[in-house]
């Protein structure tokens, strides 16, 4: 952000990104917003707010309407106008179509818009899918140099940090590791033995010029030569709930390797920590 004269952050939380920007626009929580959506099977639904926006925040569609210079900038009006201009609420199975207002009220009352269009899923090409996965695995192994380790990033139960200040989500154990209020460097037993570490040991993970430290957890099923790290912990701007929970793995990520990087270096740094 240092090379950009004006930076604006839009969101419903004051976090590290907003702290790095010159301006912060208050975004409304999803439970404060009007909107619409389509389920995987084609079912359409109108999203209704549970409460009025507490801090006069804007939803995404309201911000876009404002930036685009639209005359209508209220969430309710935007959603209603969208469906009024489309055929979504004007089509009924009966010969006599009721007016839009009746269809709109019915959609709000029922929660879904009927009749729902049927979406046909494209057939799955099993052979092509297997070939793609095999190619990706082979490429990953080819990228892995001697002595390097593949570092994988996982959003985890905190959804990458969006829920890190929610005590209920922190208390929810990870379904694989059973950890709560903490993250770890997940590693296979074979790879751990090769590096002379075990569960509870503190190690450093280096990618490029950035290094982070974390606690090892030997995890059955973890691929040899790889480590996995849950994101969303060790935040610098977290709020009192998330403070002190785990370590921050985000410094290791780059825009071209957001989820996996085969060029990692792992080293024991001494010391132990209870997970």
Model-derived features: positions:
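A cross-kingdom feature strongest in bacterial/archaeal respiratory oxidoreductases
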Residues: 1-55, 84-275
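Non-catalytic, well-ordered alpha-helical segments in soluble enzyme domains
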Residues: 59-86
């Amino acid at each position: 952000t240092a090379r950009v004269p004006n930076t604006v952050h839009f969101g419903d939380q004051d976090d590290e990104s907003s702290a790095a920007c010159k301006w912060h626009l208050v975004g409304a929580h999803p439970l404060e917003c009007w909107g619409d959506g389509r389920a995987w099977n084609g079912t359409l639904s109108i999203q209704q707010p549970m409460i009025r926006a507490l801090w006069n925040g804007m939803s995404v569609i309201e911000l876009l309407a404002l930036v685009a210079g639209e005359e209508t900038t209220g969430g309710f009006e935007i959603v209603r106008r969208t469906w009024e201009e489309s055929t979504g609420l004007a089509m009924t199975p009966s010969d006599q179509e009721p007016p839009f207002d009746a269809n709109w009220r019915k959609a709000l009352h029922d929660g879904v818009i009927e009749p729902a269009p049927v979406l046909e899923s494209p057939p799955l090409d099993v052979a092509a899918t297997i070939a793609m996965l095999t190619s990706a695995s082979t490429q990953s192994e080819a990228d892995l140099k001697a002595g390097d380790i593949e570092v994988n990033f996982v959003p985890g139960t905190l959804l990458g940090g969006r829920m890190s200040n929610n005590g209920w989500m922190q208390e929810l154990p990870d379904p694989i590791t059973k950890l709560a209020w903490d993250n770890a460097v997940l590693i296979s037993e074979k790879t751990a033995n090769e590096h002379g570490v075990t569960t509870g040991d503190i190690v450093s993970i280096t990618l490029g010029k950035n290094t982070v430290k974390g606690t090892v957890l030997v995890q059955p099923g973890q691929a040899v030569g790889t480590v996995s790290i849950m994101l969303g912990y060790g935040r610098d701007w977290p709020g009192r709930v998330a403070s002190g929970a785990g370590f921050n793995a985000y410094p290791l990520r780059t825009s071209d390797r957001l989820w996996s990087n085969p060029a990692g270096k792992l080293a024991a740094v001494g010391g132990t920590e209870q997970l």
